[in-house]
Design a protein with these regions (language model features):
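Asp-box/BNR beta-propeller blade signature and adjacent active/binding-site loops
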Residues: 1-341
Length: 341
């Protein structure tokens, strides 16, 4: 197998912002938000499950609009979380309907993010019904983007953006669990902005954080920590191009660093997969999408059988799922990942 691509059914006109994980029975649980288009009040978080036969279940609503603080709230990006005891949870961001939409730009409705908050809710995997959403803590202007990451010590990281009153974006890391509570442990800042963090822990305990560049003609930001999410280094730019779009990283037991990103300064195509065997200094890369259109917000997943998958927005119409062979990526083109020191 080089790679195999499947388009996940989507019953709404538009789809974006997926996250996925493997559940205890070996199936893959995928979620994304969908509606008329991004930023319209009719969006909900949908989900589908990839069964043992490789087929995807009929999509269903996972997180609908809900009542909170005397308002109706609209959910956006959501990410699954499976606890050691088998409990299924979802973490998501949402904003009050009264302040959800504030302007239209390039066929998108941009949201008033300063009122967005983080929530979590328990899920019944027998019916995929959701419990009452609960705020993680009392803070506004937080938007979930990345997948939830379990660290070697068992705690979880929730990966978010925050934005100040001047509109500058930063990356915010939240640590904890649904039962033990959550706290903000790190806020990473760099001009003109770094957002949508993705974190991977290497076998030696080191943590790497790669982030979207808040603008065009920039490169992916990188920060690292010896072993604690509270002491990441000041972000610095890599040499990996970024068109103001989401990226994702992951690591395997061999210490290889995987990355999925758009290898462009301006376009959300091509969509590129890369593997580094030297901690991100160099990569071997291949493109899995090269045609016109948007192929964005990738999420990497290694399942318990050792197989690698990537999920991403496919032309804003649905979510694509690709299974790929790392050996195929490793035979690809060489790419520098960091400026020489």
């Amino acid at each position: 197998m080089t790679f195999e691509k499947t388009l996940v059914p989507n019953p709404r006109p538009a789809a974006h912002g997926c996250n996925a994980c493997e559940i205890p029975d070996g199936r893959v649980w995928l979620m994304w938000y969908a509606g008329t288009r991004e930023g319209v009040e009719d969006q909900r978080v949908l989900m589908s499950v990839r069964n043992a036969d490789g087929n995807w279940s009929e999509p269903q609503v996972l997180v609908d609009h809900f009542q909170h603080s005397n308002d109706r709230w609209v959910p956006e990006i959501a990410a699954p979380l499976i606890l050691e005891n088998g409990e299924h949870w979802v973490v998501f961001s949402a904003a009050p309907l009264a302040r959800f939409r504030f302007r239209e730009e390039r066929n998108l409705f941009l949201r008033d993010l300063e009122y967005a908050r983080l929530f979590h809710a328990k899920i019944d995997p027998r019916t995929w019904s959701i419990g009452s959403p609960i705020e993680l803590f009392d803070r506004e202007a937080l938007i979930l983007q990345g997948k939830n990451v379990q660290l070697a010590n068992g705690s979880w990281l929730v990966l978010c953006n925050s934005r100040d009153s001047q509109g500058r974006f930063s990356s915010t890391l939240v640590q904890g669990s649904p039962h033990d509570g959550w706290e903000q442990v790190c806020d990473l800042e760099a001009e003109p902005g770094c957002l949508e963090p993705s974190v991977a822990q290497l076998p030696d305990g080191r943590l790497l954080c790669y982030m979207r560049y808040a603008g065009y003609d920039g490169c992916i930001w990188r920060s690292e920590s010896d072993n604690s999410p509270s002491d990441f280094s000041t972000p610095s730019q890599t040499t990996l191009r970024n068109p103001h779009s989401g990226i994702d990283i992951a690591a395997d037991d061999e210490g290889r660093l995987f990355i999925a990103y758009n290898d462009s300064h301006r376009m959300r195509t091509p969509l590129t997969l890369g593997i580094s065997v030297d901690g991100g200094r160099t990569f071997r890369c291949r493109d899995i999408e090269t045609s016109n259109g948007e192929f964005s917000y990738p999420k990497l997943l290694q399942t318990s059988d050792g197989q690698w998958q990537v999920f991403y927005t496919h032309r804003r119409e649905c979510i694509a799922h690709v299974s790929f062979d790392p050996l195929w990526i490793l035979s690809g083109r060489p790419v520098f990942g960091q400026f020489p020191r």
